[in-house]
């Protein structure tokens, strides 16, 4: 019970801090009205982009947003087979993965993480990604220690779409929150974000790659760069990632060449600096990267695009939304 009390106090402190932050921002600057995406329009982009705001998934095409789900805890959509979407639905004490149509209709529930025994036995699933052949989907999930249920370190799992059998791919470092952002490779390997903790109890993030399930893998970036949230171009020759480089005030969008055969990565180059960048995603032709970032320091997250080859100017697609920064845009053709 002690950890429950401590957790409650921590949440209360966090809520208080967020309230103070927003109150201070209200008096320091003009109060910004956050619109629902379907209340605004934007420039026309090729293809279709899915984004998330306030627990609802929106489809952006031909310069307009359409809400396809209710505001009911939906987050982190990913493209699935036959144009479908696999989406996380987060509830108070667990989350599950669902298969949705492009209009938001439920086609199936892929995980069942709510326990009938106790809240401590519930599980979380996040960051779904299908393999290029759509035969397997990867996701991050926790397997709680029954004697230490407060330990929630996510590992990456692969679930066979036909058999429904899941196998654990990665072994997370304890007390870091675990592994995240799986990106399956055509050759059968896996890119993801791995977190570690040093002797000063500081958590570091690195882009990590594994050739096969259960292997130790290797780091593609140093812990000093603080890189996370990898995204691959459709031809799997470019990696986009977010790197903090030790800063708590900014996160840069970096891009590097990648050889999916040798698993070698080139030196990262900065595409976007001076912003709090999050959740990059490539366009279907690989020429453009969509990402999320505030339009001004402390602001809400907006949708941006930038050319993947650089140097190029970032383009703001929205100005007054409040997009979910943990839900990467899903950019598909059509």
Please report, for each region that a protein language model flagged, where it lies by residue.
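Sequence signature of WD/YWTD-type beta-propeller architectures
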Residues: 2-334
């Amino acid at each position: 019970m002690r950890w429950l009390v401590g957790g409650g106090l921590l949440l209360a402190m966090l809520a208080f801090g967020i309230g103070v932050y927003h109150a201070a921002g209200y008096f320091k600057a003009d109060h910004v009205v956050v619109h629902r995406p379907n209340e605004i329009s934007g420039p026309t982009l090729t293809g279709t982009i899915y984004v998330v705001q306030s627990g609802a998934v929106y489809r952006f095409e031909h310069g307009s947003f359409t809400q396809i789900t209710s505001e009911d805890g939906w987050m982190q959509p990913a493209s699935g087979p036959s144009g479908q979407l696999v989406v996380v639905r987060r509830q108070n004490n667990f989350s599950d993965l669902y298969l949705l149509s492009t209009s938001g209709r439920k086609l199936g529930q892929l995980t069942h993480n709510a326990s009938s025994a106790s809240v401590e036995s519930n599980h979380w699933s996040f960051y779904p990604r299908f393999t290029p052949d759509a035969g397997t989907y990867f996701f991050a999930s926790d397997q709680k220690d029954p004697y230490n249920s407060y330990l929630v370190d996510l590992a990456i799992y692969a679930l066979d779409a036909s058999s429904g059998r899941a196998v654990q791919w990665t072994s997370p470092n304890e007390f870091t929150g675990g592994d995240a952002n799986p990106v399956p490779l055509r050759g059968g390997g896996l890119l993801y974000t791995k977190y570690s903790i040093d002797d000063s109890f500081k958590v570091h993030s690195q882009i990590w790659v594994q050739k096969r399930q259960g292997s130790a893998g290797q780091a593609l970036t140093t812990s000093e760069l603080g890189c996370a949230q990898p995204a691959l171009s459709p031809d799997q020759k470019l990696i986009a990632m977010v790197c903090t480089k030790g800063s708590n005030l900014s996160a840069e969008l970096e891009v590097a060449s990648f050889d999916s055969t040798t698993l070698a990565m080139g030196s990262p180059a900065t595409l976007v600096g001076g912003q709090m960048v999050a959740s990059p995603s490539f366009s279907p032709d690989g020429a453009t990267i969509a990402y999320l970032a505030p339009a001004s320091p402390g602001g809400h997250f907006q949708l941006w695009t930038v050319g993947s080859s650089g140097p190029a100017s970032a383009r703001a697609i929205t100005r007054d939304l409040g997009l979910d920064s943990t839900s990467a845009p899903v950019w598909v053709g059509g």
